[in-house]
Amino acid sequence: MNFETVIGLEVHVELNTNSKIFSPTSAHFGNDQNANTNVIDWSFPGVLPVLNKGVVDAGIKAALALNMDIHKKMHFDRKNYFYPDNPKAYQISQFDEPIGYNGWIEVKLEDGTTKKIGIERAHLEEDAGKNTHGTDGYSYVDLNRQGVPLIEIVSEADMRSPEEAYAYLTALKEVIQYAGISDVKMEEGSMRVDANISLRPYGQEKFGTKTELKNLNSFSNVRKGLEYEVQRQAEILRSGGQIRQETRRYDEANKATILMRVKEGAADYRYFPEPDLPLFEISDEWIEEMRTELPEFPKERRARYVSDLGLSDYDASQLTANKVTSDFFEKAVALGGDAKQVSNWLQGEVAQFLNAEGKTLEQIELTPENLVEMIAIIEDGTISSKIAKKVFVHLAKNGGGAREYVEKAGMVQISDPAILIPIIHQVFADNEAAVADFKSGKRNADKAFTGFLMKATKGQANPQVALKLLAQELAKLKEN
């Protein structure tokens, strides 16, 4: 029997506000343990939450970017549970009326086709703290993350393969990053994914029993975990077994999912309206103000890069996959850089350098200005493409002007015939055996002179000019 895969994803995204959702403490990642806390985060008796307007701004932008309807009557709810990293014993979230609902996003699949994936809801909530377990036998609670604003985006169960889930996450990350509401860095926990997967016989409308997957710390692992689950569940069903409702984690080392706990039924969090936060309304004017702050999104940029700049679909997709890269490209082209040349450098040498150094484009000294200047001095013959690679590394590490560095470092190509011709004659004088071979008609004897000339000029001879002059002088040599 063949089965249809049914997948839904729950994605938690940390919003990049300066302060937390209900307290004025910093929401920045990476500070010392419990440095970003105050009495609200610690839930001292008598403290009251104060809603950060910037969080609602970000929620509205997310809803608009994901084609969602917006609940204009806003309120928060208490989600009750106890855990050491949650000192209040409840989480302030949204239950029956999320900020956004009934949305969708279009994803591009590997075969070039597109599919629209529904988004059930997007709700605002506070993050919990973090427990760490020391080698000394003690467990420690860090509340830096407590109260960091989150938006949880819950998809419809519209995905029918791990590939579609991967494409959905890729598209979602792009949209959230372009909207400017999160850096969506999975390695820092600012984007976290839980997956729900079930199988059902083809033609059956009723969903099968679902399994929840956690510990999915990369899009690649989401895909691998789902692929493993498809195989595991299909084998159980074909052998006459039943799928249990359970939570599993993906074990990257063993490339398998591991049981965490069996879920007997849905958890009862006893939601009720948050009494310490008043109801408020999101006006049409507020929504339109947020709409005007949204940028051009990846889909529109890709289309423009192809139609206006003449890039291929592949190049346009690669450039727009990351907003930082796309913005860099936009500025470089606006400065007069050739779109194809800038694209080639960003996807080639720049990408290789970033991978080797383990850095992002923002963390190096390369700027649109000095990249465009470097491309210009390649085009005008000041430096060769080979030398340009060395110049690029210097610019990436040290910044500064490309032309200024080339001139100071003595890297300018020699293009003047008045300089090159005497060097060619000296090459002939220094290599009498090669000259004799050439004059006697020995096959490929002329090729050796190219290497001699480049060596004599320490690689600084303009190849096009030098080869033309060399051919000219060799012809004269043969006549004599």
Curated annotation (Swiss-Prot):
Enzyme Commission numbers on file: 6.3.5.-
Pfam assignment, any one: GatB_N
One MF term in the entry's GO annotations: asparaginyl-tRNA synthase (glutamine-hydrolyzing) activity
Sorted UniProt keywords: ATP-binding, Ligase, Nucleotide-binding, Protein biosynthesis
Function (record text): Allows the formation of correctly charged Asn-tRNA(Asn) or Gln-tRNA(Gln) through the transamidation of misacylated Asp-tRNA(Asn) or Glu-tRNA(Gln) in organisms which lack either or both of asparaginyl-tRNA or glutaminyl-tRNA synthetases. The reaction takes place in the presence of glutamine and ATP through an activated phospho-Asp-tRNA(Asn) or phospho-Glu-tRNA(Gln).
PANTHER family cross-referenced by the UniProt entry: GLUTAMYL-TRNA GLN AMIDOTRANSFERASE SUBUNIT B MITOCHONDRIAL AND PROKARYOTIC PET112-RELATED, GLUTAMYL-TRNA(GLN) AMIDOTRANSFERASE SUBUNIT B, MITOCHONDRIAL
Xref: NCBIfam families: gatB, PRK05477.1-1, PRK05477.1-2, PRK05477.1-4
Annotated protein name in UniProt: Aspartyl/glutamyl-tRNA(Asn/Gln) amidotransferase subunit B
Organism the protein comes from: Streptococcus pneumoniae serotype 4 (strain ATCC BAA-334 / TIGR4)
